[in-house]
């Protein structure tokens, strides 16, 4: 880009690139403007971005550095010779004679390119950025806390400035700032020197921050980076971001950087080369800012229906009713039935003779008793898994919110707890005292015919079978309900020994079986009454009979059919991160949809415990698979049992982060399969059962969000969609040689056979498969995890999506939260290596798959904004599985963008 404006002494102190000549072949020069250099390929995070669609574009940074030459330079005064870099004032620019030398020449940033691209390069967390001046007070306090004799040692520098979780990286920054300021830091620094360091780190001057980063890499301060120095910084960055695998391969990645930036094999690279690479890394993301700003500006225009508080309230209420109408009418019906039953029984006892003694207490007690019977019956309905799974496939699925069955179960449980306590209190604190203390003649006139001629005492009333069974019910239900609470069931409550056994899934599971006794006591309590009635007026058993029979039949059916639930293990993989993947034979007649789950039992661990896990295999696979995270006692023991029988994936001794694998043959492929299975824990399954994710086919656009192991229900969905896209796979869903573990879909069958070529055409997004099933047009999968090793769980699936999804139907976004977000100095060099490595061979250095990995956490508002603008007037199904902390923000964003745009987001979450 040419600029003929005369430069004065008051001009910016930045170097300005006049023109760049690019010589693609090395023997000719073609002039290219700066805008061309910076208009690089948009970086896709999805499947399209997973494979190199144009390697030459992705390698643009390296090719520019190799072939560019500089014609004209302007004075900047910021960057001088290596000798002047060490001081605070970086000195005058090099003379023209010194600038013109053979080989690659310095390319300085311009306001339009690198100034935008590098504006996010920072040494502090984003939470501190923008509040640096205010943060100095906290730093002063920490200095006073950690300083020894008025000087802060190097090992406390990171803690003092807010980089306490990356002390090693902070120490390198400390050394670089000391060299830059020519301060001897061996014995620590005082407060004034600390303030100088802090001011250097927070300067808005891009050159200053880049210079600090270069000085941190340039350990000997000679102005040149050797391969060993680059390797050292890569190791440092990998440690700061907890990337163990990247740390192992630091030498090869350093060699890759030198290969790209040092084509003449001089043995070093210079600051300007590093700067150009940094600019190329981040400038792509900047190219979309104008579009995003215009979208935000459009969103800022307030719709007419929002301009008054009343109209806004009406619109929001209407939207909420539209979104949750099924839940609203079911809960309303439930409340109405409870109110009607209460009022009916209340009015009935206003005419009872006992009303003259007890007053309204008796009426209220009988009213609560009636609705307690109803709710003790209803609470069993949401846990009739087989029945609900069947009903999901009927027209009732359009009327009843089966996805909220667990929430409705919890709602009724809360109602039962409140009603039971109220019913008990009315009897013990009102009815019994009045009956036992009223005048005898009063008692004889109104209660003698019903309760007997002898007036009972309070203790006598408390010792009646009705009272005893009622109190026992309260005790059993109280224990069961308490241990079912989230804090106990998830073992969040840390109780002292030996009470620690009262928390966890096992306690929840066994305590719930106390309710069998509670139901028996309920029937006795409702049959042996103080006031005698004929049997047909004792209605408690009538309420609970049908739900109890249905529940008992489901449990009994599972026990009777248990011999058919035995499966054989095809393969088991124990991953680092305490994750066990089980691949097992599929029982005959076991039909399921993607998104469903099943129960798994290991009798060798416990004969009675069944645990639910999402199915990760596709319906068309000949095998079943589940991925189990070892969190509790049972899952940890299961993982350990299989780990004992596993063999290392490689012959060499594996490191703690390597995979451990065990493989067996499936039934039919090995005549001695029963003998081989004797080595491994026995596994039984039952199911499948319906889950919210199975309704994904109702939507044309999917947004799948999984946190950690919460990705499991969506892996089955992605495999099913990929089955529809992959050539040579039958679309009827009968046989599918899918990926097992980390193996590719294109590999051999898990049974040792060749892949099956099925009929049916390869369909694009949103088409109907050969089997008549409708598939979504697009699927966006966001997988957020905090451990690099987690990507190994579904590496094969990610690679297959990158290879076979030619039309970008599936777009994957992997996020690693242990890494510092893009623009942070602690992850800057890793971003460079990621770009170069992916451009070279199409493999991501973080996930070691073909799908690019993003740093830190997603900006969910940005995700929803982009989808709403990309898919206007569409219905997007948002499916989430993971930590409950993200449920409320995602649900709020769905409601917000459904109101403010023409796109409608429908939120679903798993209920495990």
From Swiss-Prot:
Start and end residues of each Ferric oxidoreductase domain: 366-523
Residues in the Cytoplasmic compartment per record: 1-323, 385-410, 480-510, 719-912
Record domain EF-hand: where: 205-240
Pfam families linked to this entry: FAD_binding_8, Ferric_reduct, NAD_binding_6, NADPH_Ox
Highest rank taxon of the organism: Eukaryota
Extracellular compartment spans: 345-363, 432-458, 532-697
A Gene Ontology molecular function term of the record: calcium ion binding
Keywords: Calcium, FAD, Flavoprotein, Membrane, Metal-binding, NADP, Oxidoreductase, Peroxidase, Phosphoprotein, Repeat, Transmembrane, Transmembrane helix
Regions that span the bilayer: 324-344, 364-384, 411-431, 459-479, 511-531, 698-718
Membrane topology: Multi-pass membrane protein
Protein's cellular compartments: Membrane
Ranges annotated as biased composition (Polar residues): 29-44, 78-87
Listed GO CC annotations: membrane
Positions of the UniProt region annotated as EF-hand-like 2: 181-193
Record EC number: 1.11.1.-, 1.6.3.-
Modified residues (Phosphoserine): 294
Region (EF-hand-like 1): 147-155
FAD-binding FR-type domain location: 562-695
Disordered: annotated segments: 1-51, 73-112
UniProt-listed CDD domains: NOX_Duox_like_FAD_NADP
Binding locations of Ca(2+): 218, 220, 222, 224, 229
Subunit details: Monomer and homodimer.
Function statement: Calcium-dependent NADPH oxidase that generates superoxide.
UniProt family annotation: Belongs to the RBOH (TC 5.B.1.3) family.
Protein name: Putative respiratory burst oxidase homolog protein J
Classification lineage: Eukaryota, Viridiplantae, Streptophyta, Embryophyta, Tracheophyta
Gene label: RBOHJ
């Amino acid at each position: 880009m040419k600029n003929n404006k005369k430069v004065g002494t008051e001009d910016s102190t930045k170097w300005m690139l006049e023109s760049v000549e690019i010589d693609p072949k090395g023997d000719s020069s073609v002039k290219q403007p700066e805008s061309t250099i910076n208009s690089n390929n948009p970086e896709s995070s999805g499947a399209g971005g997973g494979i190199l669609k144009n390697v030459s574009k992705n390698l643009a940074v390296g090719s520019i550095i190799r072939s560019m030459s500089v014609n004209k330079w302007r004075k900047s005064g910021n960057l001088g010779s290596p000798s002047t870099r060490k001081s605070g004032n970086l000195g005058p620019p090099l003379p023209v004679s010194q600038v013109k030398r053979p080989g690659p020449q310095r390319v300085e940033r311009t306001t339009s390119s690198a100034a935008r691209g590098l504006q996010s390069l920072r040494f502090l967390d984003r939470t501190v950025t923008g509040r640096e001046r205010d943060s100095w007070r906290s730093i002063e306090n920490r200095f006073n806390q950690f300083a020894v004799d008025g000087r802060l040692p190097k090992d406390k520098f990171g803690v003092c400035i807010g980089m306490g979780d990356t002390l090693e990286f902070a120490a390198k920054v400390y050394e670089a700032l000391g060299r830059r300021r020519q301060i001897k830091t061996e014995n620590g620094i005082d407060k004034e020197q600390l303030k100088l360091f802090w001011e250097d780190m927070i300067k808005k001057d891009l050159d200053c921050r880049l210079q600090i980063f270069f000085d941190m890499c340039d350990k000997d301060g000679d102005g040149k980076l050797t391969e060993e120095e680059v390797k050292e910084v890569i190791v440092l960055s990998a440690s700061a971001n907890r990337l163990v695998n990247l740390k192992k391969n630091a030498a090869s990645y350093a060699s890759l950087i030198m290969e790209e930036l040092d084509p003449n094999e001089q043995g070093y690279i210079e600051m300007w080369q590093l700067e150009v690479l940094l600019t190329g890394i981040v400038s792509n993301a900047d190219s979309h800012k104008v579009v995003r700003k215009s979208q935000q500006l459009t969103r800022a225009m307030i719709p007419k229906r929002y301009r008054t508080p009343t109209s806004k309230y009406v619109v929001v209420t209407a939207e909420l009713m539209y979104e949750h109408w099924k839940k609203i009418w079911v809960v309303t019906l439930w409340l109405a039935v409870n109110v009607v039953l209460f009022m009916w029984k209340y009015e009935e006892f206003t005419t009872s003779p006992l009303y003259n003694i007890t007053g309204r207490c008796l009426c209220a007690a009988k009213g609560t008793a009636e609705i307690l019977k109803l709710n003790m019956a209803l609470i069993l309905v949401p846990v009739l898994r087989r029945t609900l799974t069947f009903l999901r496939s009927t027209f009732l699925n359009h009327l009843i919110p089966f996805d909220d069955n667990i929430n409705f179960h919890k709602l009724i449980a809360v109602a039962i707890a409140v009603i039971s306590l109220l019913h008990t209190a009315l009897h013990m604190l009102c009815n019994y005292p009045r009956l036992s203390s009223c005048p005898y003649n009063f008692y004889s006139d109104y209660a003698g015919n019903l309760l007997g001629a002898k007036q009972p005492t309070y203790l006598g009333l408390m010792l009646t079978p009705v009272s005893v069974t009622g109190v026992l019910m309260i005790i059993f239900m109280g224990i069961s309900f308490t241990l079912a609470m989230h804090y106990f069931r998830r073992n969040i409550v840390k109780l002292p020994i030996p009470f620690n056994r009262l928390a966890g899934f096992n306690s929840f599971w066994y305590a719930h079986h106390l309710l069998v006794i509670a139901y028996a006591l309920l029937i006795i309590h409702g049959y042996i009454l103080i006031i005698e009635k004929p049997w047909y007026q004792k209605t408690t058993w009538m309420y609970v009979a049908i739900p109890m029979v249905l529940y008992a039949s489901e449990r009994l059916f599972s026990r009777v059919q248990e011999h058919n639930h035995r499966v054989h293990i095809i393969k088991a993989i124990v991953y680092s991160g305490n994750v066990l993947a089980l691949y097992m034979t599929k029982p005959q007649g076991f039909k399921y949809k993607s998104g469903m789950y099943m129960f798994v039992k290991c009798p060798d661990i416990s004969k009675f415990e069944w645990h639910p896990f999402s199915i990760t295999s596709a319906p068309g696979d000949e095998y079943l698979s589940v991925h189990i995270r070892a969190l509790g006692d049972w899952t940890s023991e299961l993982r350990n049992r299989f780990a004992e029988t596993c063999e290392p994936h490689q012959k060499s001794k594996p490191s703690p982060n390597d995979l451990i694998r065990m493989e067996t043959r499936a039934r039919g492929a090995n005549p001695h399969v029963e003998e081989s299975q004797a080595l491994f824990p026995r596994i039984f399954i039952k199911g499948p059962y319906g889950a919210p994710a199975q309704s994904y086919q109702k939507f044309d656009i999917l947004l799948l969000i999984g946190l950690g192991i919460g990705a499991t229900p969506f892996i089955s969905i992605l495999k099913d969609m990929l089955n529809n896209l992959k050539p040579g796979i039958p679309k009827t869903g009968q046989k599918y040689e899918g990926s097992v573990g980390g193996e590719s879909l294109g590999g051999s069958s898990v049974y040792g056979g060749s892949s099956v070529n099925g009929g049916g055409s390869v369909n694009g997004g949103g088409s109907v498969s050969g089997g008549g099933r409708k598939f979504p047009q697009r699927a966006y999968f966001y997988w957020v995890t905090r451990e690099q090793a987690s990507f190994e769980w579904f590496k094969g699936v990610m690679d297959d999506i990158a290879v076979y999804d030619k039309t970008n139907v599936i777009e994957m976004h992997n996020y690693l939260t242990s890494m510092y977000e893009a623009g942070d100095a602690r992850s800057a060099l890793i971003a460079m290596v990621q770009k170069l490595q992916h451009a070279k061979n199409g493999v991501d250095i973080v996930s070691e798959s073909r799908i690019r990995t993003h740093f830190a956490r997603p900006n969910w508002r940005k995700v929803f904004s982009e989808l709403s603008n990309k898919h206007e007037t569409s219905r997007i199904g948002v499916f989430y599985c993971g930590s409950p902390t993200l449920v409320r923000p995602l649900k709020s964003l769905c409601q917000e963008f459904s109101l403010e745009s023409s796109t409608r987001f429908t939120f679903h979450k798993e209920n495990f």
